[in-house]
Amino acid sequence: MELWQTFVKMVHALVPWLDGTVAIILIIFIKAIALLIPLMLVVAYFTYAERKVIGYMQLRIGPNRVGPKGWLQPIADALKLMTKEIIFPTKANIYLFLLAPVLAIAPAIAVWAVIPFDESIYITNLDISLLYVLAIGSIGVYGIILAGWASNSKYPLLGALRSAALLVSYEIVIGFALVTVVMIAGSVNLNTIVQAQQGGIIYWYFIPLFPIMIIFFISSLVETNRAPFDVVEGESEIVGGTHVEYSGMTFAVFFLAEYANMILMAVLSVIMFFGGWHSPFEAIPYLESVFSWIPGMIWLLAKTTFFMFLYLWVRATFPRFRYDQIMHLSWKVFLPITIIWIFVVALMTQLQLSPWF
């Protein structure tokens, strides 16, 4: 909160004629821009990292032509997509066709408003920030469903139907998985959940909730349409799914939304199960002092990078699951395990097993 108060004072000093409400709106707007620009850069270079990592896993070099070692490849890709023509299918509903990418990208950006990067670095600190993330994050699928419907083509429609079914299935699993975290932390505030895990790696929730952490990670792959669960846009089955009729910047917007959601799920995994911005060496006498100079945000970024690498590793090593296998995994495997683990956590809470309860 000290950083927030300092920021407020700076704005009032620069523009003293602003009243309190306008100043707060201006501050939130500035913080939103400060978050949006780095997020788009991270998304752009995550695509570069993906191509490089998967290339090395397949004994290839990956992008290496544009700029030194291919570092300018994301910029070249962006310019290419910006200059491509946007083609509208003959029988498409043009208004809904253009609205769909907006519905996909808007929630993917809006949900970052409540994500804390450190104890005092966030846009807003909602008491119900976890519920906000679940509510806003689930809206993005309507963009995919609308894209499938508005394209007036059979392959996008099949992709939209799959997307709707997967949303219903895995939103329930993710919701039940996060209930266990809320039961231990006693709050739905993301900041409070992270603070409850301070004290070192032994206090992090991935230890008592290890099966739930695995389920959450796999479910996040499904929710973000990532391989091996990318049946919504399976090229070998439905050509490209909901994206097949999109081109140029309309396609790029869907692309940005998918990768922004991937980064979001990686950050959520860190916040929920791996102590957020806390160092793993807290309360360890010698190591705590050695690593005390590293800011909390750096720890958060390092843990998030690890999960983002896991996304790439899974994509490069596992074949695509069939649609019926994914549904079976949700309803007959993950859902029963999460329900059972809720009762296990309730029992451990009553027994007050230290150090988590």
UniProtKB/Swiss-Prot annotation:
* Entry-linked InterPro entries: NADH_UbQ_OxRdtase_su1/FPO (IPR001694), NADH_UbQ_OxRdtase_su1_CS (IPR018086)
Catalyzed reactions:
a quinone + NADH + 5 H(+)(in) = a quinol + NAD(+) + 4 H(+)(out)
GO process annotations (BP): aerobic respiration
Keyword annotations for this protein, in alphabetical order, are:
Cell inner membrane, Cell membrane, Membrane, NAD, Quinone, Translocase, Transmembrane, Transmembrane helix, Ubiquinone
Major subcellular location class = membrane
Can you tell me where the transmembrane regions are? Answer: 22-42, 94-114, 130-150, 164-184, 199-219, 254-274, 294-314, 333-353
The chain's disulfide connectivity reads: none
Q: What class of enzyme is it?
A: translocase
Supply the EC number(s). Answer: 7.1.1.-
Q: What is a single cellular component term in the Gene Ontology annotation?
A: plasma membrane
Classify the protein's membrane topology as the record does: Multi-pass membrane protein
Subcellular location per UniProt equals: Cell inner membrane
What Gene Ontology terms describe what this protein does at the molecular function level?
A: NADH dehydrogenase activity; oxidoreductase activity, acting on NAD(P)H, quinone or similar compound as acceptor; quinone binding
The UniProt family comment states: Belongs to the complex I subunit 1 family.
Quaternary state and interactors = NDH-1 is composed of 14 different subunits. Subunits NuoA, H, J, K, L, M, N constitute the membrane sector of the complex.
The task this protein performs is described as: NDH-1 shuttles electrons from NADH, via FMN and iron-sulfur (Fe-S) centers, to quinones in the respiratory chain. The immediate electron acceptor for the enzyme in this species is believed to be ubiquinone. Couples the redox reaction to proton translocation (for every two electrons transferred, four hydrogen ions are translocated across the cytoplasmic membrane), and thus conserves the redox energy in a proton gradient. This subunit may bind ubiquinone.
Name used for this protein in its record: NADH-quinone oxidoreductase subunit H
